[in-house]
Amino acid sequence: MIHVAFVCLGNICRSPMAEAIMRQRLQERGISDIKVHSRGTGRWNLGEPPHNGTQKILQKYHIPYDGMVSELFEPDDDFDYIIAMDQSNVDNIKQINPNLQGQLFKLLEFSNMEESDVPDPYYTNNFEGVFEMVQSSCDNLIDYIVKDANLKER
């Protein structure tokens, strides 16, 4: 089983949105060898469900997010692929776990966009724009992991 973790600051906006989108795309593509997680590098929202803006955009596109609560990225977390939303997240991840074993990327490395960081809709309130960025990157990320880990699609 391959473990992928999306990481943002509070684990209530971007990373749970990415987790939910990725789970749905994996299911649609018939890929069952990838388990998706999300984490935050900050402690403010531990145990809380996704932000209302994240919930609304996921509901709009009929993407389930049941049972999701904010979790902290820990030094002993063991993920094969760690997908950060921005450079600050990358820096925090490396500080939390300087001996990181998994592959670390920024999500937009898998997009065709000029931007390198997914902006935090907690501050911008642009949940629709973030949804589009995340969704457009997930299929390319899946393609990369399937090839890199030599997985099969149905």
UniProtKB/Swiss-Prot annotation:
Gene3D superfamilies: 3.40.50.2300. GO terms for molecular function: protein tyrosine phosphatase activity. Signal peptide: none annotated. Its EC number is 3.1.3.48. Transmembrane segments: none annotated. Disulfide bonds: none annotated. It catalyses: O-phospho-L-tyrosyl-[protein] + H2O = L-tyrosyl-[protein] + phosphate. InterPro entries: LMW_PTPase (IPR050438), Ptyr_pPase (IPR023485), Ptyr_pPase_sf (IPR036196), Tyr_phospatase_low_mol_wt (IPR017867). It comes from the Bacteria. The active site is at 8 (nucleophile), 14, 120 (proton donor). Keywords: Hydrolase, Protein phosphatase. It holds the Pfam family LMWPc. Dephosphorylates the phosphotyrosine-containing proteins. Belongs to the low molecular weight phosphotyrosine protein phosphatase family. This is Low molecular weight protein-tyrosine-phosphatase PtpA. It comes from Staphylococcus epidermidis (strain ATCC 35984 / DSM 28319 / BCRC 17069 / CCUG 31568 / BM 3577 / RP62A). The lineage of its organism: Bacteria, Bacillati, Bacillota, Bacilli, Bacillales. The gene is ptpA.
